[in-house]
Regions:
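Acidic helix/loop or adjacent segment enriched in Glu/Asp that either coordinates divalent metal
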Residues: 79-116
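Amphipathic protein-protein interaction modules
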Residues: 104-137
């Protein structure tokens, strides 16, 4: 049974449209069960694009098995105005990622960990990352927001990654 916050959220990829979060989670479980001794990274990240009358946000969920493939999907959110303030846009990107991360409840995370757990001594692993579309370089306009956004993701229990390591955002 889906919780209330997950019922309105829809995802898509090249194979399926209008997936619920439960369907997404089942795809992730099936992907991991196909090779339970894998090195898995569950990654959530959001990027945005400003258009003349709107700003489009794309949140990606990627489950990656190092050297063995990925399964991924996206969620698209449209804000009906140009979000020109950089801090507002970066903060909203982070909020959308936080929303999706929150759908991975402790019970769901435990279910994913339990897939790889019997294979830990053979090198299996599982981690969860939040990718943020910001960088710490001296010329990067987003560098002043790094600490704030990193702290937000750490607070919800995911490992934050920034550019150039944040490839999902």
């Amino acid at each position: 049974m889906e919780n209330d916050s997950a019922q309105h959220v829809r995802f898509q990829n090249l194979q399926e449209d209008q997936m619920t979060f439960n369907q997404v989670f089942e795809h992730i479980v099936a992907f991991m069960r196909s090779r339970p001794a894998g090195n898995y990274r569950l990654i959530v990240g959001t990027d945005s694009q400003i258009h003349p009358q709107k700003t489009i946000f794309i949140t990606g969920i990627v489950i990656r098995n190092k050297g063995k493939g990925v399964w991924a999907c996206i969620r698209k959110v449209t804000v009906p105005r140009k979000m020109l303030q950089l801090h507002e846009r970066i903060s909203y990107e982070t909020s959308l990622s936080e929303e999706i991360v929150s759908l991975f409840t402790e019970e769901r995370k435990r279910q994913l960990i339990d897939i790889v757990l019997p294979h830990i001594y053979q090198g299996a692993s599982f981690s969860m990352e939040g990718h943020i579309d910001i960088g710490a370089g001296k010329k990067n306009k987003t560098r002043k927001f790094v600490q704030e956004m990193v702290t937000r993701l750490e607070a919800i229990g995911v490992e934050p990654k920034i550019k150039p390591d944040a490839f999902v955002a």
